[in-house]
């Protein structure tokens, strides 16, 4: 019996609909070569099985059957691990899975647009494709940690201690701590605190709308086990909200004067966050460790607390509190109704140990809409 792989159609008969990436062509060619070798191995196994039956050699037949079972399992693993096409967008990969509820005791929201709460197995392949595109256009210089982080993302996230486990992207070799000192981003902290009165006055103007309806235009309500948590975004996952910015023009202009505000990728946010009395935010992890989350206290009643990595801290009006939200964290307002809501202005700043070249690359890799 003669074995031969079937002939493929002539290349001239195929009209390509796109020009594929050379890296993907190389990956696909290597995959086809692997399968060609596997088919040759299958041919030899079947031939050995037939010969064993003819010779009535029970030991050889048992051995061949075991090898066939191992071969079938290996084929399943190869097929399962074959990367998906890199031409889908990051947003489609992130949004393709169903929004989650409460998992493993930690909170997930129900928004398909939320970067933290939606995942997809093809995300790392897409991120690597984005990194390759960026490096070809600019340079691989300074990309070592990002390359390492994307390449070994699964191992990093699976092996992280439960106290810190970012949901989407972990950049290796960053100094880590639940809370950061004010000097970590001194310029931006001082600028925010100097503009405390401005931000507070614009909040008070937009918060008056709550007296006329339960959820005024521009506000979002977040899922909590008790109480109510409202947010008013100026920038949501790297996307500016023009209608909201018009209502807080001076606060929005202030963002442009911050040196380390993450405004160009999906990990960057700026919003007013309101907790009503009796509210508890379920403990959860943020999406990445490349940022520092900054809370500027606007209205802080008693019995309000933030807990990050098991360490409690209290906000203070007119002062910034910096923390790494990739640590397990929660917040609550146990004050009375008479005390009113807890209000902070939240803004995401770059981790001080993320280099300028890395920031530029991460803005490209995690750009909104990619």
Swiss-Prot record:
Q: Does the keyword Transmembrane apply?
A: yes
Membrane-topology descriptor: Single-pass type II membrane protein
Which InterPro entries is this protein grouped with? Asp/Arg/Pro-Hydrxlase (IPR007803), Asp/Asn_beta-hydroxylase (IPR051821), IPNS-like_sf (IPR027443)
Q: Where does it localize? A: Membrane
Q: What is its EC number?
A: 1.14.11.-
Which Pfam families did the record assign? Asp_Arg_Hydrox (PF05118)
Enumerate the residues binding 2-oxoglutarate.
229, 273, 293-295, 342
Q: What does this protein do?
A: May function as 2-oxoglutarate-dependent dioxygenase.
Q: What family is this protein classified in?
A: Belongs to the aspartyl/asparaginyl beta-hydroxylase family.
| Name used for this protein in its record | Aspartate beta-hydroxylase domain-containing protein 2
Organism, by scientific name, is Xenopus tropicalis (Western clawed frog)
Q: Which gene encodes it?
A: asphd2
């Amino acid at each position: 019996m003669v074995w031969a792989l079937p002939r493929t159609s002539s290349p001239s008969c195929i009209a390509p609909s796109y020009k594929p990436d050379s890296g993907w062509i190389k990956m696909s060619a290597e995959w086809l070569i692997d399968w060609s070798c596997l088919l040759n191995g299958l041919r030899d196994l079947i031939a050995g099985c037939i010969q064993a039956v003819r010779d009535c050699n029970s030991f050889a037949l048992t051995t061949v059957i075991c090898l066939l079972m191992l071969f079938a399992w290996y084929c399943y693993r190869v097929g399962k691990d074959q990367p998906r096409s890199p031409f889908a967008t990051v947003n489609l990969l992130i949004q393709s899975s169903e929004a989650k509820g409460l998992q493993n005791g930690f909170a997930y929201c129900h928004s398909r647009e939320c970067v933290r709460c939606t995942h997809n197995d093809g995300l790392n392949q897409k991120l690597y494709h984005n990194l390759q595109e960026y490096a070809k256009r600019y340079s691989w210089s300074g990309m070592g940690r990002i390359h390492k982080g994307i390449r070994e993302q699964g191992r990093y996230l699976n092996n992280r201690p439960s106290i810190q486990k970012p949901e989407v992207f972990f950049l290796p070799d960053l100094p880590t701590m639940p809370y950061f000192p004010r000097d970590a981003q001194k310029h931006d902290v001082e600028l925010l605190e100097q503009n405390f009165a401005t931000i507070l006055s614009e909040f008070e103007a937009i918060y008056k709308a709550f007296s006329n309806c339960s959820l005024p235009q521009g506000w979002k309500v977040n899922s909590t086990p008790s109480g109510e948590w409202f947010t008013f975004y100026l920038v949501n996952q790297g996307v500016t909200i023009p209608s909201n910015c018009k209502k807080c023009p001076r606060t929005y202009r202030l963002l442009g004067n911050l040196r380390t505000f993450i405004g160009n990728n999906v990990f960057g946010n700026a919003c007013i966050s309101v907790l009503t009395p009796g509210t508890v935010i379920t403990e959860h992890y943020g999406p990445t460790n490349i940022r520092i989350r900054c809370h500027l206290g606007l209205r802080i009643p008693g019995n309000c607390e933030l807990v990050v990595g098991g360490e409690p801290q209290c906000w203070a009006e007119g002062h910034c509190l910096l923390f790494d939200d990739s640590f397990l964290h929660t917040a609550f307002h146990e004050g009375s109704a008479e005390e009113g809501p807890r209000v902070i202005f939240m803004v995401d700043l770059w981790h001080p140990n993320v280099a300028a070249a890395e920031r530029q690359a991460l803005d490209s890799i995690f750009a909104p809409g990619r």
